[in-house]
């Protein structure tokens, strides 16, 4: 029997409507409009595409947006000056600096300059620390999206063994911290695997929930998955192009084989991807409410 397909596009659409209603109510009751500033350095086509999608989503939800493009030759000082201005701008609830950045720019220096209260990507050390302590913070968008996918799909997390393959600062590490918390939608036993892990299939096959975030197409095969497990595929790799020039994407999981063994599985595309941008919008809304003293 084939697995239940967890449709991230549908779940993200439901959250989008919830956010739209909140944005409308926030404006009507308090005269507050959430605002997102995006900063893009250089002309990388993929980065342009990502930023464009975020701007369009803001427009769709009634969130004010500003875009600040900078040339490839921009310096640390250029970015720090811009971020200081955005930090001080009351119209801006959240600031997003699109990464990767050119080699001459210190990513840590720039991201750490963002006011933690406007760090809607959840990358600032203050937010990372709050996340680890289980305090109110902005959760990184992709890990938060994974948690929401599980919760809204009715999949129990509490008490389960979650195995995460990948230890990046963007996905693996924060997701482990999120799911470890003694809180609803968490409280799992978490194992992290990585390039130095020995006997990887032995560990992954013990998972109730298996999350792969490596960027290695079809690396997770059916023999690495326990019968009846939930499989979340965060990996997204371009493996080619259609004759029309559209990207062909592959996840980390051998989807066709694994879906015959799993209880539930996310596809690529239309799985985790749509959740990332909607979590960014949710963080921007939350930032606006916090700035107004409406939530903690």
From Swiss-Prot:
Source species, domain of life: Bacteria
Binding site residues for NADP(+): 166-168, 195, 236
Recorded GO MF terms: methenyltetrahydrofolate cyclohydrolase activity; methylenetetrahydrofolate dehydrogenase (NADP+) activity
Listed PROSITE patterns: THF_DHG_CYH_2
Keywords annotated in UniProt: Amino-acid biosynthesis, Histidine biosynthesis, Hydrolase, Methionine biosynthesis, Multifunctional enzyme, NADP, One-carbon metabolism, Oxidoreductase, Purine biosynthesis
A single Gene Ontology CC term: cytosol
CDD domains: NAD_bind_m-THF_DH_Cyclohyd
Pathway noted in the entry: One-carbon metabolism; tetrahydrofolate interconversion
GO annotation, biological process: L-histidine biosynthetic process; methionine biosynthetic process; purine nucleotide biosynthetic process; tetrahydrofolate interconversion
Keyword NADP annotated: yes
Reaction catalysed by this enzyme: (6R)-5,10-methylene-5,6,7,8-tetrahydrofolate + NADP(+) = (6R)-5,10-methenyltetrahydrofolate + NADPH; (6R)-5,10-methenyltetrahydrofolate + H2O = (6R)-10-formyltetrahydrofolate + H(+)
Protein EC: 1.5.1.5, 3.5.4.9
Function: Catalyzes the oxidation of 5,10-methylenetetrahydrofolate to 5,10-methenyltetrahydrofolate and then the hydrolysis of 5,10-methenyltetrahydrofolate to 10-formyltetrahydrofolate.
Protein family: Belongs to the tetrahydrofolate dehydrogenase/cyclohydrolase family.
Subunit and interaction comment: Homodimer.
Protein name: Bifunctional protein FolD
Organism phylogeny: Bacteria, Bacillati, Chloroflexota, Dehalococcoidia, Dehalococcoidales
